A protein has these predicted regions:
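Histidine-anchored nucleotide/phosphate-binding helix
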Residues: 142-157
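Gly-rich Lys/Arg/Thr-decorated short loops/hinges at beta-loop-alpha junctions or inter-strand turns
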Residues: 71, 100, 123-137, 258
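Short histidine-centered loop motifs in beta-beta connectors
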Residues: 9-18, 22
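Conserved hydrophobic positions within beta-strands
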Residues: 42-44
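Acidic low-complexity segments
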Residues: 51-106, 117, 173
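Ferredoxin-type iron-sulfur electron-transfer modules in oxidoreductases and energy-metabolism complexes
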Residues: 311-327, 337, 341-404
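Hydrophobic alpha-helical positions that pack around
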Residues: 162-272, 278-285, 293
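Short hydrophobic beta/alpha edge segments that flank linear recognition/processing sites
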Residues: 19-33, 48-51, 58-65
Length: 404
C-alpha cells in the first residue's frame, strides 16, 4: 500500500475476496497519495504488514493469481489526445495511480498541479537513463515511442503548455532516431541529444543541461518553469487516459548473474524471484540482489520481495561485484567534492552526520544531496557517504513532521 511517495493507501479488500485485474484494492490516503490497483485477477489471500525494502514494515495485499486476467470495465477518456478535455486529464491520472517510475515515485497528479503563482513553460521527458545496467526506458523508447509522445502531449494539454522536450543521452542513437520520428510534424515537440555522463538523468542536472536554468537551493523544477517526467511515466499517462488502464505494470530490467538478461513487462507486485525465473534463473547464487541501479539502488533482504512502481531494474550481483571493503579514515583528498554534481562538501557533511547534529547537517546542505552515489564511488577510503546522507535526510524529514 506504499508504492509511492506520500501517505499510504488504505486496503479496500479482505481475505477471501475475488478481485479483477485493475480493480482498486487500496484507497488514496490524501492529496499526496494514490489508490492501489490489483495487478492480477484472483483471490485475496493476505492483508497484512510485511517487512519490505530497508527493513520497513508496510501494509500489503497478497492475491493468488487465477491466471485469467479478468479486467474491470475500462473507461477511456477519448480515442486520441485532441479529443480529451484538459480538465479531465489530471483526475484520470490520479485515479489510475500513476507516479514516477523511479526515484522517489512522486504522485504525477501532484507534479502536474501547478501551484498558484507559478508558471510551467515546458515539460521535459527524461530519457537520459544514465545509470549503469538500467535499460528499461531505452527499450520503451524503441518499442513504444508513440505512447510516450501521447503521454507527453496529454501532460502538456493538462497543464496548458506548448513546449515539450524529450531529452536522451547521445549513447542511445537508436532511441533518439525513434523518438525523432515519433514527434515529426507535431508542433511544440522536440528531441534533444545530451552528453552521456552520470548523473545526467538526475532531475536538476537534466534541467540545467536542457534549458540552462538552475533549480535554486531548496527549490523545485517548477521554480524555473519546468516539469520533468520519465519515458515510462509518459507512457503510463497515455495508457490511463486513452485506454482507461490503471498503472499495474512497468518495464523492468533484469540483469547481473542471470542466464538471459532482459527487459520484462512486469506486473507490479511480482516477486523478484519470478522475474529471475523468467530470465532462465541465476547463473550462480547471488551475493546481493539490488532493486534499482548499482549507484542508487537498494539491496533486498531476499528475492521474495515484490517489485514496485519504482522498480526500474533488478540486478543480481556476485560476491566479487558486491562485497564492500571496510571503511578507512577520511584523508581529506577532496575527491568527493570534485565528484559531487551538486557542488557540496560530502566529507564535511559526513562529519556532521556522524555527530548526529541534524541542524548542522541541514545547514551544510545535506538536503541538497541527490543521493547519486558519486562521492561513495570515488572515495579511496571506501567511506559509505551516500547511505549516511540518505539516512540523515530521512531523519531530518521525520523530525520536521514531528515538529508539526
Amino acid at each position: 500500500m506504499s508504492l509511492f511517495l506520500g501517505k499510504p493507501s488504505t486496503p479496500l479488500v479482505k481475505v477471501g475476496d475475488h478481485v479483477k485485474l485493475g480493480q482498486k484494492i487500496g484507497e488514496s490516503g490524501g492529496f499526496v497519495s494514490l489508490p492501489v490497483h490489483a495487478s492480477v485477477s484472483g483471490e485475496v489471500i493476505g492483508v497484512k504488514s510485511q517487512m519490505m525494502l530497508m527493513d520497513r514494515p508496510e501494509m500489503t495485499v497478497t492475491i493468488r493469481n487465477d491466471m485469467q486476467d479478468e479486467w474491470i470495465d475500462l473507461t477511456p477518456l477519448g480515442q486520441d489526445v485532441d479529443s480529451v478535455a484538459p480538465s479531465a486529464i489530471i483526475p484520470a491520472i490520479q485515479e489510475a495511480g500513476i507516479c514516477g517510475l523511479g526515484g522517489a515515485a512522486f504522485p504525477t497528479h501532484v507534479k502536474l498541479s501547478i501551484p498558484e503563482g507559478k508558471r510551467c513553460e515546458a515539460i521535459i521527458v527524461n530519457g537520459a537513463e544514465c545509470e549503469t545496467h538500467v535499460t528499461a526506458d531505452h527499450r520503451l523508447m524503441l518499442e513504444n515511442p508513440g505512447d510516450i509522445v501521447d503521454g507527453l502531449r496529454l501532460a502538456m494539454r493538462a497543464v496548458g503548455v506548448e513546449t515539450g522536450i524529450i531529452a536522451i543521452e547521445d549513447n542511445k542513437k537508436d532511441a533518439i532516431a525513434a523518438m525523432q520520428q515519433a514527434v515529426a510534424g507535431i508542433a511544440g515537440l522536440s528531441v534533444v541529444s545530451l552528453q552521456a555522463k552520470y548523473p545526467q538523468g538526475s532531475e536538476k542536472q537534466l534541467i540545467y543541461a536542457v534549458t540552462g536554468r538552475e533549480v535554486p537551493s531548496k527549490g523545485l523544477p517548477i521554480d524555473v518553469g519546468v516539469v520533468v517526467l520519465t519515458a515510462g511515466w509518459a507512457s503510463a499517462i497515455a495508457d490511463a487516459v486513452l485506454r482507461g488502464k490503471p498503472l499495474i505494470q512497468r518495464v523492468t530490467t533484469v540483469t547481473g548473474c542471470v542466464k538471459e538478461p532482459a527487459n520484462l513487462l512486469a506486473r507490479i507486485g511480482t516477486p523478484v524471484s519470478e522475474l529471475v525465473e523468467a530470465c532462465g534463473g541465476y547463473t550462480q547464487a547471488p551475493y546481493r540482489v539490488v532493486m534499482g541501479g548499482c549507484m542508487t539502488g537498494l539491496c533486498t533482504p531476499n528475492d521474495a520481495v515484490p517489485t514496485g512502481k519504482r522498480t526500474n531494474c533488478v540486478i543480481a550481483l556476485t560476491e566479487k561485484e558486491a562485497k564492500t571493503q571496510a571503511e578507512g579514515p577520511c584523508i581529506r583528498c577532496g575527491r568527493c567534492i570534485e565528484a559531487c554534481p551538486m557542488g557540496l562538501q560530502p566529507y564535511k557533511m559526513r562529519q556532521l552526520c556522524d555527530k548526529g547534529d541534524l541542524k548542522a547537517a541541514e545547514a551544510a546542505n545535506v538536503m541538497e544531496c541527490v543521493v547519486c552515489g558519486c562521492c561513495t564511488y570515488i572515495c579511496p577510503a571506501r567511506r559509505q557517504l551516500t547511505s549516511i546522507f540518505k539516512n540523515t535526510k530521512d531523519a531530518i524529514v521525520r523530525e520536521a513532521r514531528r515538529a508539526k
